[in-house]
Amino acid sequence: MPNPVVFFEIGCKDTAQTREFYGKMFDWNVAETPTGAMIDPKGGIPGQITSLGHEPHQYTIFYVQVDDVAAAISQAESLGGTKIVGPIPIPIGTFAWISDPGGNTIGLWKPK
């Protein structure tokens, strides 16, 4: 697969409650962080629970790894999608959020 799904994010208002729910529901290792929690699903795709983000806080996003975040945003726009935010550089890579023509939010990710 040339552009694999590599990460997911669950947005919420109550990170403690959300951590407890997903940890117990799916037997995931959920480690508390200053902004929520990192999820290690024991062999699956890693993710995070966070209270950071936009309104509404309740959302789920999967991230697709791309070679060039800006180029992927341009391609999405040419296909009828919309840039929501980004590209945003962070210490371990660059990400963006786009929406497809139906309004679904998708994350784009390029590691350093």
Regions found by a protein language model. Give the residues of each.
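Short amphipathic alpha-helices within nucleic acid-binding modules
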Residues: 21, 70-75
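A structural feature recognizing the 12-helix transmembrane core of secondary solute carriers
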Residues: 36-39, 71, 84
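Conserved short beta-strand elements that form part of the metal-binding/catalytic scaffold
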Residues: 27-59, 105-110
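N-terminal first-folded block
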Residues: 7-40
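Helix N-cap motif at beta-to-alpha junctions
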Residues: 14-15, 67-70
